[in-house]
């Protein structure tokens, strides 16, 4: 869990523009905004960098700080908590799309034992070695943008046999009563209209799905 003071500092850096790219930021200026000493501000920057929430670089005119993807995710998780507090009636989202054929990457990655163990540990089911690929309709593409604030689970990467495997994010969901999860590999950039879904069974066979069939994905939170 992120310490409250680190989260406060991270939020301040983001408000100053750190999510858009490196910004000039001295320890003294950060301390002035937060109402703390430059020494304390420096320690917080070091702590954020250690957690890989920010990057720091020195240039002739001073220090530049940028919020990383991990830092953005920490802020989005905090935002998701506030959504649950102030908008309790928003219990979930529904994505609608059509089934499409994938390129086989999902089958490969889901067949790697360490991936299967990690996904099984955080989702409560051992994933079938393959994914269901869905192309979203226009309305669901817009809905998908809100999912950045949903309850994603980070799955860390690992190294095996001198090869590095990237991490991923998974979002628990339901398809016609089957427990599933949307999976987004950290090293892959998918079009905004496409999602990959994993489950404990072969969804195509279990639900008798073919390419171009319409399907709904339900994402809920407590």
UniProtKB/Swiss-Prot annotation:
Pathway: Cofactor biosynthesis; FMN biosynthesis; FMN from riboflavin (CTP route): step 1/1. Mg(2+) binds at residues 131, 133. Residues 1-92 are annotated as: Unknown. CDP binds at residues 102-107, 201-204. InterPro entries: RibK_CTP-dep, Riboflavin_kinase_archaeal, Riboflavin_kinase_CTP-dep, Riboflavin_kinase_dom_sf, WH-like_DNA-bd_sf, WH_DNA-bd_sf. Keywords: Flavoprotein, FMN, Kinase, Magnesium, Metal-binding, Nucleotide-binding, Transferase. It is an enzyme of class 2 (transferase). Its cofactor is Mg(2+). Residues 93-222 are annotated as: Riboflavin kinase. Binds 1 Mg(2+) ion per subunit. This is Riboflavin kinase. The lineage of its organism: Archaea, Methanobacteriati, Methanobacteriota, Stenosarchaea group, Methanomicrobia. The gene is ribK.
């Amino acid at each position: 869990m992120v310490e409250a003071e680190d989260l406060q500092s991270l939020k301040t850096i983001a408000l100053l523009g750190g999510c858009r790219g490196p910004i000039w930021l001295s320890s003294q200026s950060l301390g002035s905004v937060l109402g703390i000493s430059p020494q304390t501000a420096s320690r917080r920057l070091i702590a954020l960098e250690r957690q890989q929430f920010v990057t720091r670089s020195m240039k002739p005119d001073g220090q530049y700080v940028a919020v990383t993807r991990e830092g953005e995710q920490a802020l989005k998780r905090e935002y998701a908590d506030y959504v649950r507090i102030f908008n309790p009636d928003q219990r979930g989202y529904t994505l609608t799309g059509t089934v499409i054929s994938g390129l086989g990457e999902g089958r490969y990655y889901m067949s790697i034992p360490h991936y299967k163990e990690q996904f099984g540990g955080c989702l409560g089911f051992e994933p079938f070695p393959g994914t269901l690929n869905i192309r979203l309709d226009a309305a669901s593409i817009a809905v998908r943008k809100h999912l950045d604030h949903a309850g994603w689970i980070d799955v860390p990467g690992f190294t095996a046999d001198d090869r590095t495997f990237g991490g991923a994010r998974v979002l628990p969901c339901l398809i016609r009563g089957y427990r599933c999860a949307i999976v987004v590999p950290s090293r892959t950039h998918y079009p905004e209209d496409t999602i990959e879904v994993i489950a404990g069974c072969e969804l195509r066979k279990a639900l008798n799905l073919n390419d171009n069939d319409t399907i709904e994905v339900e994402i809920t939170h407590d």
